[in-house]
Amino acid sequence: MRRFKRKHLTVVDCHHLARSHLAVTQPFSQRWTNRDPNHGLYPRPRTKGRNRGRGCQRYISEFFLAGHQHCTNDMAKSNSVGQDSCQDAEGDMILTAESSCTLPQVDNGEARLGSSGSAQPARKRAHCFEEATESGQWDGVTKKTPRHRLFPSCSRLREARQGAEDSLSQCSPVPGEAGRDIEDIGPDPLPDSYYGLLGMLPCQEVPSHICRLPSEVLRHIFAFLPVEDLYWNLSLVCHLWREIINDPLFIPWKKLYHRYLINEEQAVSKVDGILSSHGIEKDSDLCVLNLIRYTATTKCSPSVDPERVLWSLRDHPLLLEAEACMRQQLPDLYAAAGGINVWALVAAMVLLSSCVNDIQHLLFCLRRPSSTVTMPDVTETLYCIAVLLYAMREKGINISNRIHYNIFYCLYLQENSCTQATKVTEEPSVWPGKKTSIQLTHEQQLILNHKMEPLQVVKIMAFAGTGKTSTLVKYAEKWSQSRFLYVTFNKSIAKQAELVFPSNVICKTFHSMAYSHVGRKYQLKKKLNLFKLTPFMVNSVLAEGKGGFIRAKLVCKTLENFFASADEELTIDHVPIWCKNSHGQRVMVEQSEKLNGVLEASRLWDNMRKLGECKEEAYQMTHDGYLKLWQLSKPLLASFDAIFVDEAQDCTPAIMNIVLSQPCGKIFVGDPHQQIYTFRGAVNALFTVPHTHVFYLTQSFRFGVEIAYVGATILDVCKRVRKKTLVGGNHQSGIRGDIKGQVALLSRTNANVFDEAVRVTEGESPARIHLIGGIKSFGLDRIIDIWTLLQPEEERRKRDLIIKDRFIRRWVHKEGFSGFKRYVTAAEDKELEAKIAVVEKYNIRIPELVERIERCHIDDLDFAEYILGTVHKAKGLEFDTVHVLDDFVKVPCARHNLAQLPHFRVESFSEDEWNLLYVAVTRAKKRLIMTKSLENILTLAGEYFLQAELTSNVLKTGVVHCCVGQCNNTIPVDTILTMKKLPITYSNRKENKGGYLCHSCAEQRIGPLAFLTASPEQVRAMERTVEDIVLPRQEALLFLVF
C-alpha cells in the first residue's frame, strides 16, 4: 500500500495555531502579505492528467457547495400525510432565503457584499481562482502561470493558499514530503471532527456530507425548514437529528405556532397564559404596546449590536415611524442601557407594515453583513409575533388579519424556497398550445413521492391556481410503469388533458364512459334526449288532474335527485322538501304531493329505461339518466392502477359510488371552496369521502400577494377557513384599481353580462369583445326569439319575424309572452328568467343591441379587449385583470358601521354564494378591480388600506382635516403618527381618493393599533364621529324584511 502523503498536525499543534495571533480558523481576516503565514494549510489542486475520483472535492470549500441531488424514481412510500425521499430531503438543505425574501436591488449595494467587502460571493471567488490560473506545482517546483489578469480577490486567495502551504510544510513531521511528486497525493478527504487538519488514513471510511456537521450548524440549517419536514422526514434520519429537532430549545416559537394552529391543548394554554399575564387582552387599550414589550423580552445572541442593526435598517421605509413610536410610547425600550431594544423595534415595524413587501424588506435589511442578528433569531421573533397576533384574533381583539398574513407569507416563501426545483411545462386551459414553465413546490413534491396502492383513497386539497393539473401530469410521468385513468366533468378539459398527460394516462369524462357502455344503445334507437328534462316536457305526460308546471317541476326535481344519488331505488326521500307555489312563495311540500311526485317520477323513469321508440320527449333517455344506469350496473375498471378524479368538489354521490367501488387506488383532486354546482346535486367529495392520505396545495402560481390576500380573507371571514392559508408568488399584483393587460368582466348572472356587453360596445369606437364559451352558448338567438314573442301578432307578420327556437315557438299559439313568463317563474328556470329580464329592460333596442354585440364579438380571445362571462363559465380560466361586477353577495357597509345593521350576519348567506365570489377573485393574475362590497368584506378582517406616516410630515403644508365626510376633527400636532387611507377605484368606476384620518376615526377602524400613533388619552379627547349609512333601496328593503 502506498503511503498516504499528507501534512499532519497534532492536536497540540492545532490548539497552538488556534490560540496564536495568526488565527488559523480565520486566515482571511489577517493582513495580506506576499507570504501568508498560514501557507500550506490550504488543500492543493491536482496538476497533472490524473482524474479525481467521483464525488471528491479539490478544496475544502467544495464540501459545503455540494450540488443539489435530484429525486430518483425510487421514492419511499409516504405516511398518511406524505413524506419526501432521502435524496429530496438532503437537497432541500441547500436554502437560499434571498430567492424568496430578498429585494431585487438596493441602492447602496451593501446587501450583495460579503464580509470581506468583495461584491462577489465566496463560492464565485473560489471558482474564479480555479478558472483564472493554470495548475502548477507549489513550493518552488513550478509556479502558477496566469491565463488572464486576475481579480484582486482571486489573486489574494492564490497568494493565501501559497503562503499557507509553505507554513504547513514547516510543521510537517515527515521531512522531504514537499519535494515529492504531487501527482501521488490523493484527493482531500472529507472533513472529520477536526475538519481534515489532522489528516486521514487511507483505509478510513469517508463520512457522509451533512451528517458530520456539528450540531450547531445542523440546528442553524434545520431552522430554515418547514415544521412538517422536520417532524415527518428529518426526525426519521438518525438519532442525532431527532434529538436536535425534539430539543425544547430548538425553534420553540415556530413549534408553538404550529401547535397552536392545530389547537393542541398545551399550546393553547401556554399562549393564553402569555396573553393574560402580559396585558394582551380585549379590554386593554395598550394590548398592542404590551405585545411589543413582550417581544422585547425575546432572548438573543449577546453579539447583537443595536447600533449596527440600526445601520442595517437605515433605508427601510418604516424605520423612522417605528423609532418615533418607540421614542414616544415605549421610552424605556428606546433608551435602554445597551441601546435600543432590537426586537421591540422589529415588532413595531412589523405592526406598522401595510404589505408583505415591508416585511420582506425588513428581512433583507437584517440579512445584511452589517447586521449582527442571526436569521434563526429573526425567524423566531416573527413566529412569536405571529402566534400572538393569531391568538389575539381568536380572543376577539380588534386586530387586522393583514399583519399576521404578511408575516406568514414571508416565512412561507422563505421556508419553501428551492434553488433547483423541478421545472414543469404546463399548458393553461385559457390559451391552448401556449406552454409556461413552472417550478414544483415542496407540497407538490410530497405528492409525487407517494406511491399509490390498491384501495387507497388520496385527497389533494388544492387552492385556486396551485397547479393541480401539472401535479397530476408529473405524478403520471414519475410513475410511468402504472396505468392511470383521468376523469373530469368537462369535455373540453378532458381533450386538453389528452395533450399534456403522458401515454400511460387515459383521459375521459364520466358521461363519455357511461355513453360508451349504456348511452350508445339509446342513441341507436333514437331515444336519446340531447337536452335537459324540463317541466314543460313532463307536464305533457302527467296524469289527468295531476298536471301543472309546479307539479311537473316537482317531478323533474325528484328525478334529478335520484340521478345524482347513489341509491338503487327511487323513493320518497328523493322528493324535495321545499317548492314554490303559484304565488312564487317558498312553501313546504305536503305529504300527499310527495307521494304523487314519487309515483309520477317512478312511472317516468320506467318509460325512460325502455329501449323501444317513443314520441313523447319526457320518455327519452337523458345524459344524467344513462349515467345513472351505468352506475347501477356496477362497472369495473380493473385495467387501471389508479384513478384521478379532477374537480372532485363537484362530484355527485352517484359518481363517487362508481369511483369508490373500484379496487384500484383513487386520487380526488379539487378545491373545496370552488363548489358552485350544488344546485345540480353535487356534494363535496373532498369533505364527505373518507381518505387514507391527504395532501394540500396552498401556493398559487397564478397571482401575487395582494390577490392572494383577498382570496384568503374571503375564506377566513366568510367561511372561517384559517388552518390552511392561500399564498401566491413573489410577483407583483394590485387590487386598488389600476389595469394591466387583458380585462375580464366577470358576473354572477347572464343578465349582467349582457349589460356590460352593451356598455363596452357603445360609442364611436366599440371595443372588441369575447363571450366566454362562445356567442352561440350565450343564447343571443333565444333573446331575439323571446323579444319576437313579446311583439304583437300583427307586428310579427308585418316585419316577417320568425321564432327559431322550437320550445319558445310553442307559446305563440298557447298563452303568448305572459304565459311563457309564468311558466319560467313556476319552473324556476334561471337561464330563461335572465333572458326575459334582458328583453323587458331593453325592449325595442334588443335587435340593434344583439346585432352590435355579434358584430363586435371575436372568437379568438387573445385579440379581445374585454372578455365577458359568468363565473360558472370562467371557472378554470385566468386573466390578467379581472373586474368583479356588482351582482354578487353583498356586505352593505364596513365593519365599524355594522353595529347599525344588527340583523346582518355573514352566516346567513349560503356557502355557494361565497364560493362564487372566491372563484371570481381568483381568476385574476395581475390586477383585481374590486367592488365596494368586496372592500367591506376585507374590513371585516380589519383591512382598511391604511398607511402610517409621521405627523410632522403630514402637517408641513398646514392644518389637515380628517378625510371622513362627516368628521370635523383635524390632525393634532402633538401626535406621533397619522394614518392615511390609500386611494382605490371600484369596478363601477367610482373612486375613493382616500386621505388622512383623525386618530378617533382610525381607532374605530383598526382598534388598538391606533394607540401606536397617539396615546389613549389623546384619542379619547377627540370627537367621535358616527357615519350615516345610505343603502341602495333594494338592499334597504331586504334588511327591513329579514
UniProtKB/Swiss-Prot annotation:
What compartments host this protein? Answer: Nucleus; Chromosome
Pfam families found in the cross-reference section: F-box-like, UvrD-helicase, UvrD_C
Q: Which GO terms describe its cellular component?
A: chromatin; nucleus; SCF ubiquitin ligase complex
> Which molecular function terms from Gene Ontology are attached?
3'-5' DNA helicase activity; ATP binding; ATP hydrolysis activity; DNA translocase activity; double-stranded DNA binding; single-stranded DNA binding
Give the matching InterPro entries.
DNA_helicase_UvrD-like_C (IPR014017), DNA_helicase_UvrD/REP (IPR000212), F-box-like_dom_sf (IPR036047), F-box_dom (IPR001810), P-loop_NTPase (IPR027417), UvrD-like_ATP-bd (IPR014016)
* Lineage: superkingdom: Eukaryota
Q: So what EC number does this one have?
A: 5.6.2.4
Entry annotated with the keyword Secreted: no
Domain spans labelled UvrD-like helicase ATP-binding: 441-704
Assembly: Part of the SCF (SKP1-CUL1-F-box) E3 ubiquitin-protein ligase complex SCF(FBH1) composed of CUL1, SKP1, RBX1 and FBH1. Interacts with RPA2. Interacts with RAD51. Interacts (via PIP-box and RanBP2-type zinc finger) with PCNA.
How does the record comment on the protein's domains?
The PIP-box mediates the interaction with PCNA.
Q: What is this protein called?
A: F-box DNA helicase 1
Question: What species was this sequence derived from?
Answer: Mus musculus (Mouse)
State the taxonomy lineage.
Answer: Eukaryota, Metazoa, Chordata, Craniata, Vertebrata
The gene coding this protein: Fbh1
